Structures are given as C-alpha cells and as structure tokens.
Amino acid sequence: MDIILLIQAVIMGIVEGITEFLPISSTGYLILSADLMGFWTKEKVDLFVVVVQFGAILAVIYDYWGRLWQALMGLLTGKAEGMSNPRQLGLSLIVATIPVMIVGFTFADEIKAYLFNPIVVAIMLIIGGLLIFYVENRPKAIIAEEAEDVSLKTALMIGLLQCLALIPGTSRSGATIIGALWLGVSRKASAEFSFFLGIPVIIGAALLDFIKHRDVLTSSEDWLVLGIGTVVSFIIALLCIRLLVAWVSRRDFKIFAWLRIITGVLVLIAAWGFGYQMAG
C-alpha cells in the first residue's frame, strides 16, 4: 500500500471539493496539482479528474435534496410545495442541459485531442478572469431572484454558455454563474442554478468516462485511491457549497478573477519558458 499515493488522493479530493463550484476551473487546478505532486499515471489522472467530480456533485444532491425533490415532483405532477410554478425549475434545467450534452457527446474526443494543452488552458483562464471583471462592473437589472424564477429563454442561454466550459480552463461554474449574472439572475440564484445544472452534466460525464476507461484501474489500490478522492471531495464540497452561497450574498467574484488571471500567466510562463506540458 503506497501511503504517499493515498495522501495525494486526499489532497486531490480537497482541491476538487474547493474548486468545483468556484468560477476558476476545477479541472485545471486538479491537473496542475497532479503535475506538481507527480500523482499517478496520465491515464489514471484523466479518469480520476472526471470521476472525482461525482463526489462534489453528490454534495449538492445531499444539501439540496428537499428542494430538488420538490422540483422533480413539480416536473412530474405539476404540484410542488412552496413553488408558484412547480414545473419551472425542472424544465429550465432540462433546457439548459441539452446544449452541452449535444456538443459534449459530439466533440469530446476532438476537444481532448486538440485543446487540452497549457496554452489553451492559460488563455481561457485569463479571458475568463477578464469577463468576470466585465460582468461585475456593468449595471445589472435582476430578472430572476430565485433559481425557480429562471425562464426557459434564460436557461437556454445559460446552457449555451455552459458549452464554453468544454474548452479546458474555462470552468463550468464560471461559465454558468457569471453567464447567469450577465443575463440578470441574482447572485444567489446564479450560484444555485449552476449547482443544480451540474448534476446531470457531471454525473453523465463521470459515468461515461468511468465506463469507457475503468480498465486503467488494475488493482485494489487503484480503486481505493479513486474512492478516497471521491469521498474527500464530497465532504469538502459540502462545506464549500454553504460558504459560497453565504459569500455571494455579500461579495462579488473579483477575487476569483484575479486568481484566474494570475494562474493563467504563471501557466503561460511555465509553458513558454520551461516547456511545461499538462499531464491530462
């Protein structure tokens, strides 16, 4: 049993749990962390990075179970306690999910082959940071105070913006939260709609990648490493979800814009100056 490998799995789970719902690209930080620690082989890191997100999204399901159940019942029966428009949230999430499912399933291999390099990641980190500054500094007219108020048109726009997250370094949370803010959704509703939208997307991607590449797990230790990372990401994400919701009700996202830009510049320096190539 490699204790160092298990410790690295814990660290990777912590990184995932912290970064998954922040607008900073959790995948980018996971791969950078794996490279810095010399964590696992390339094939196993590729699988780990996708599957460990399952733990983080389980935290959303756990924390919002009552609300998600009401949304599901509203969608199926047209009745949900405390919802004036019971079907709205469920329909909006379906509409917002369709674009990324189509684009993701169609171009996933091409994106991984041609866009998964440090230059693309760095550029998208920097562009994303600049866009956060732009959205945060423009006047906002709120059209949706709660996630249940997001219209189908707005949901479709958020779903189209989520497709940008297929480009490495963009951040699914960044594209959806900042995109929702730009479209006039309140801060709290933007964060929560992004949380909910991640459920079908992340679960679908994790299951698909696991089914396709589970043969890279060749020992019980491999399964243990993946399991530890997933459990740790669940625990840390559960804490971070609550902190983020509290944060967005009082502050903006500019600190994350700076973090994206600084990280992007450092990755560019590493790539151009030292020939750095991402393991993923």
From Swiss-Prot:
What is the stated purpose of this protein?
Catalyzes the dephosphorylation of undecaprenyl diphosphate (UPP). Confers resistance to bacitracin.
A Pfam family hit: BacA
| Main subcellular localisation | membrane
Gene Ontology molecular-function annotations: undecaprenyl-diphosphatase activity
- Protein family membership: Belongs to the UppP family.
- Cellular-component GO terms for this entry: plasma membrane
Q: What reactions does this protein catalyze?
A: di-trans,octa-cis-undecaprenyl diphosphate + H2O = di-trans,octa-cis-undecaprenyl phosphate + phosphate + H(+)
| Record keywords | Antibiotic resistance, Cell inner membrane, Cell membrane, Cell shape, Cell wall biogenesis/degradation, Hydrolase, Membrane, Peptidoglycan synthesis, Transmembrane, Transmembrane helix
Bilayer-crossing regions: 3-23, 45-65, 88-108, 115-135, 150-170, 191-211, 225-245, 255-275
Major enzyme class: hydrolase
The reply on keyword Amino-acid biosynthesis is no
Mind telling me what this protein is named?
Answer: Undecaprenyl-diphosphatase
Membrane topology category: Multi-pass membrane protein
User: Remarks, anything else?
Assistant: Bacitracin is thought to be involved in the inhibition of peptidoglycan synthesis by sequestering undecaprenyl diphosphate, thereby reducing the pool of lipid carrier available.
List the EC numbers from the record. Answer: 3.6.1.27
An example Gene Ontology biological process: regulation of cell shape
The major lineage groups are: Bacteria, Pseudomonadati, Pseudomonadota, Gammaproteobacteria, Moraxellales
Location in the cell reads: Cell inner membrane
Identify the PANTHER family for this entry: UNDECAPRENYL-DIPHOSPHATASE
